[in-house]
Amino acid sequence: MDIQPWYLKTSKLALALAIIHSKPADRSSREYTEYLASLVTQKESTWKSKLEALEAEVLQLRQKLLLSRISSGLFKNGPDVLPTLSDQEPTSSENTLTLMDDSGCVLSNEQRNEPAELSQHFVESTDPPLLPLPLEKRPRTTLENPLSSHMQFFQHLLELKKWTESSSLKVYLTHFEKDSSTVSDSVSQLLDALITFYRNPKLPFSSFWTEAVGTLARLASDFNLSNHIFKRCSKKLEEFEKTLLQAILENNSINRFQVQRYVSQSLVTLGSCSLLRKSIISLLLSEVNSFVDDLGAIDQDQGIYDVTRYENIFSLFWILEQVLQQAPQGDRTAHMDHSIPEMQTFLQKHDEVIFRLSDAFPLFAFYLWRLGVLLNSAEMETVKNESLP
């Protein structure tokens, strides 16, 4: 007889007898068991909250320690090497993006920001302000507040790295190699919060979240950082990319275009990094190819198509156009990778699809044509650059 199952059965029997003997007279055994279970659940929830708070404190201490080690290494090389950090902090939830002030229905050219202008403005403001050391504790009243310390940490880290590189110092890499887990754990928590928010983004859209995505993009654009961090967080990063995509495609609210604009810009920001560029393009083209197949089948059978999905797919076209037209950060010499299966599939059936859908869906066919032109141009540019001596 196996001892483990026997001990388990004996323990269950002993627990049942103890509950029966200790239950109050005015309660049944079942009621008393449910009462005890609720007490245990409450205690577990309390202890879990305390554990999460302690883990957050430990991570914050690890962040301070890493920054202090890097700073002390810089100081040994001379006080003039140390960077001066400003006293500003990441944008709070009270400071929301100004584009959210309108209803999304204003058509005036004076009040309307074109996507290109929005993209240019965002790229120019992706370097968020830095905070003084040490990292400060903030009241944890909202989802944003616990992340403020991570944002401060990443901003300090990137600034210190910039100074070590400009000073030709190896202090940064020495300490980072020994404790890269601190950064990867911080990135993991930042991704968790971003995934939670973007699963159900609501208005007004806080600029904190766009700054968080911008910081993530800066980390991904740095070769030394991304080489250590994102191989540990690759699955979570992939989940975040898919969450952003679903936030666009599955949104069926009347005022969804405002939210889609900012979610789309987040994908453009991620797609500007050479490390994430391929996965973003692959993800978007996969969805476009799938919709093309569905639309072709509907057109052939004279069926009814999902109007909301049809409208939402145009955001994907805009994202792809923006990503394809800008040079990737972190590797300016990088070219388009035409080995992406989704890209090959798109280009192979490009002309046929346009011819077949141009009568029933002329606008959709026009955007397909534009996207095809960009992809073919990128391919020709890549071949040209590779053929040069």
Curated annotation (Swiss-Prot):
N-terminal signal peptide: none
Compartments where found: Chromosome
GO cellular component: chromosome; lateral element
Entry keyword annotation includes Membrane: no
Transmembrane segments: none
InterPro entries in the record: MEI4 (IPR025888)
Gene deletion effect: Deficient DNA double-strand break formation during meiotic recombination.
Region (Interaction with REC114): 1-127
A single BP term in Gene Ontology: oogenesis
Name of a matching Pfam family: Mei4
Tissue-by-tissue expression: Expressed in adult testis and brain and in embryonic ovary.
Keywords: Chromosome, DNA recombination, Meiosis
Assembly with partners or alone: Part of the MCD recombinosome complex, at least composed of IHO1, REC114 and MEI4. Forms a complex with REC114; the interaction is required for MEI4 stability. Interacts (via N-terminal domain) with REC114 (via C-terminal domain). Interacts with IHO1.
PANTHER family for the chain: MEIOSIS-SPECIFIC PROTEIN MEI4
Protein family membership: Belongs to the MEI4L family.
Function: Required for DNA double-strand breaks (DSBs) formation in unsynapsed regions during meiotic recombination. Probably acts by forming a complex with IHO1 and REC114, which activates DSBs formation in unsynapsed regions, an essential step to ensure completion of synapsis.
Designated name of the protein: Meiosis-specific protein MEI4
Gene source species: Mus musculus (Mouse)
Organismal lineage: Eukaryota, Metazoa, Chordata, Craniata, Vertebrata
Gene coding for it: Mei4
